Amino acid sequence: MRHTLVRVRAQAWPALLAAHGGIGTLPFVRDWAARGWPLIVRRRSPCDAGVPLGLPLPPSAGKRRVALAAAREQIDSACALPTLADVGRQAPPAWRPTLARLRALADAHRVDCRVFGSLAWQTLTGLRYLSDESDLDVLLMPCGASSSASLFRFSSSFASSFASVSVSPSSPSVSIPQSSRAWPVPALAGASSSAAVTGAEASAPMTAQMEASASRLSRWPGSSSMPSRRDAIAPFLAALAEIDADAPMRIDGELLCADGAGVNWRELHAGGRAVAMKTATGVELVAPRTFLEAWR
């Protein structure tokens, strides 16, 4: 699912690069797998023939976001994003009180807070990703779901591609912001480059999208047992907004369901009638209550 870290087999890396044009000449790319650094599952685009992966280069290498697609046999393992505790040492000193407040808030509300973006990649690689303009990017998931492999399992669209891949939901291994910006897709042999589809251009009427999404999410096991989930999460989002207002950096991120569907926390906190829900393949408009009933 989106935001899952995967490691490509080192011996498969040359073939993977060869299938994606001349990207092996970019800084850090050729030795990425040999260094044990992971890639991240990104949103699928129409031209992907395999598991869609992203490789974010640091600012010193142009901050380019390289899109790859790996075959099942090229994947070695998968693991979760880092926790707030994992990234503490790499965080700027000015950020650390905010991280502590976030950790306390998450614990109090039984929310599993994972980190992606610049801070996570700096922790993962040791390369410098953070700048004075960096945000803190977080994923917010219910603790009950994150305690098992189900939270970090790949969504059904990727399941067949990972039939033989080991998954480590609690791995301490420690990401790139999965915003509406697309990952550029390197040119393939005999094909021209194209951009990944973000789904922001979806043209279906809002009501039709919301009804379709409601139907899909209503099939989530036990989704009808917590009709007041929006009310329950409101105090958490309000406290998160207070921490964000006091923080030296912007706190960005999503509430994430176990199937990889996610909604920006600011949209949910704003209390609008519809929110943009990112999925493995695009963006859907849904009612906040519909999303939150599945977020558990």
Residue ranges, per PLM feature:
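Helical scaffold of the NTase/Pol beta-like nucleotidyltransferase catalytic core
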Residues: 1-118, 237-249
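Broad gene-expression machinery/nucleic-acid interaction feature
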Residues: 50-52, 133, 137, 250-252
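Solvent-exposed residues in well-ordered beta-strands and their adjoining turns
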Residues: 56-58, 141-143, 256
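Short, solvent-exposed loop/turn segments at secondary-structure junctions
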Residues: 60, 120-121, 258-260
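Catalytic cores of NTP-dependent nucleotidyl/adenyl transfer enzymes across multiple folds
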Residues: 63, 72-81, 88-89, 259-296
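Active-site nucleotide-donor binding segment shared across nucleotidyl transfer reactions
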Residues: 101-136, 140-151
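Intrinsically disordered, low-complexity terminal tails and inter-domain linkers enriched
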Residues: 144-238
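Conserved catalytic core of two-metal-ion nucleotidyltransferases
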Residues: 227, 231-277
